Amino acid sequence: MTGVPIAIVRVAALGAMGTDLDSMVAALRGDHSGIGPANALEQRPASEAGAGQVDLGVSTDGASDGSQQHTQRADRAEQLLRRALDQLLGTDPTATLAVDASQVAMVLGTTLAGMRHCGAAMRFESSGCISDAMRSYTGIPAGSVMRQALAGLPIAGAASTVSCACASALSAIAHGCAVLRSGAASCVIAGGYDPISEFAYGGFSALQLVATGPLSPFAHDRQGMKLGEGCALVLLRPLPEALARGESPLAIIDAIGESSDAHHLTQPHPEGRGAAVALASAVVNGLPDLLIAHATGTAGNDAAEYQAYRTAFGAALPGIAVTALKSRFGHPLGAAGALELLATLKCADAGFMPAGLGRPVDRHAFPDINLLHTEPRAGSPHRITVLAAGFGGANVALSVTRGGNGAPVTVTERRAAPTSVRVGIRAVGCVSAGGRGLSGLRQLADSTERDVSEETLMPLLDRSRTRRLALLPRLMLAACRDLRDAAGLTADELASTPLLAASWHGAASFTEQYYRDLLASGIDLANPVLFAESVPNVGSAHVSLGLGMRAASATVIGTRTAGLEAMFLASCRIRVGEWHRALVVMADESHPTIDAVLSHCTGRAVRSGSAGMAFLMERIDGSNPELLPEVTGFEHGIVERGGSRPAMTGHGGATIMIPEIGCVAGPAALALEIASRQSNEVAVSCTDPNGFSWTVQASAHGDLKSFATV
């Protein structure tokens, strides 16, 4: 990490161990487990394995009457997020934030967003309640969950949701720090959430990852995980500003490490290589006094994680205290890592380190792990590191140093982030109904076709490796390989390049197949292949796997503007010096249910199409003297909810006719505007039906490399 230190000035969390952090600390002092009956599951499994469920009885903590009414109408995702926001911001959110609403950014992480609404919609359809079904379908995207939870709050800055499965919350915090350091916001709310759901329970059970006995991390007879739920949020400010305001930071973010295994969709690398890389970056400033393990209790995860610890810490490992709290919270998916970190920080303030539960450690397999088991240990660790890992091989490790509550807080001198870094677009890749490249995009407005043909895809894909994949990752892989041909990237260059994917609706076809089968066959007979191919970050996962990309990876999800949002986040990471380049890829599938829902929302017939597009964004500096098209800025806002637009607003207010190709539409319009050379300065705007509005500004000088065959 580079630039000014970032302070965690306020925190909030809900989990199976308590509906606020104070109640969690009290529970973690003893031997209480939050694992119990999973009454909130939409279906009951034949064998009750239990889960970590949050008590969402009506709360009055820090919530206005309006937010109370809101949470009673919402499903669990919106309730968890809104309750945490109310805790975080208190009774006077405007005074708490103390900056203009446009300067408050939000980066959230989630595994499944509003997926519970999908099951509700399908049940409404089966009952013939079509209007209710359409309304429920609109609640699935992450943008809908976020917009509902933000109702009435003074938050109007950049707002995005990222997904890299169970590493989502820590990934969101990493991106939030970059947004803050880039100057795009004065403060950032970051963290993650996920509710318990039949979608997740059925899938993990089908993969044989759910334990019937206790979750027992690093034990010889460990059986697997327990599903959980929760939400954990932090309010971030630059440390100098926080101190100037008289705020007492709970902690300072010391370092963050990110990596990808590029190994398997649902299994970690057996030697923990990616996790070791992330940990090494996170502890560059010093070893932790306490390590919060990911520790899902599955055979593969715990073995790989231990190998990562041995690689990262070596002979120092036995001296580092380790805690594994999913044995008490369950696995909260998109809140994982952040939830355990905040609970542990509060326990440290209270003078103890919390312990996990379950069966004893297997000392033969894990001889060097100093695991806190059953009994909390007295102590107030100064430096704490947390690791999170997710499907697709994403790894994020984060280290903090405690501050406030009597601990000294100082501003540490660090290398300043670049103040005038320029970000260029070296190359683009594209597949659309018009064919391959920008020439294909140009034909879309006049084409009657809406979907990418197999004739376009197959020359770009290894059929033996991709024929069983969902369409979404195939579109992304094809666009990336088109870009690779344009830019001439080597395998080594790809391996070290960070990856940000984007999708509005994800793998829509496989998701529908999985969920309809789940409802027809029952929660105990879910399809494991369809589940793995339906998670929102499946695109970034398969691109990482297919191209051997081992740096940071995540997917921006749930809005029509997700493609522009991914470009914004990549631009922030490049501008603050964390990344030199980034591969940004976006894709969306067409689907009749998407068309029906958008038609219902907008009052006009919508016929969506499929497309994939990739951008190679990189820093323009002395080592890169070429004249490249340049991304000069972004504007963003939250406006009144409205219909999805079939076209983009370009330079001078002119309308660029782009068919409905999801989150690809905005970036496609940008590429066409740059390539047209009608103006040196380009601006393209796009708005999501939930009111998230984004504009990207660019200078069109230089050559935009693209593979233009059709």
Regions found by a protein language model. Give the residues of each.
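Conserved "HGTGT" condensation-loop signature of ketosynthase/thiolase-family condensing enzymes
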Residues: 1-157, 178-181, 197, 202-226, ...
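Short loop-beta-helix segment that forms the pyridoxal 5′-phosphate
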Residues: 158-163, 553-556
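Active-site histidine-anchored catalytic micro-motif
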Residues: 172
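Short glycine/serine-rich loop segments
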Residues: 176-196
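Short acidic donor-binding loop at the edge of a beta-strand
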Residues: 186-189, 383, 580-581
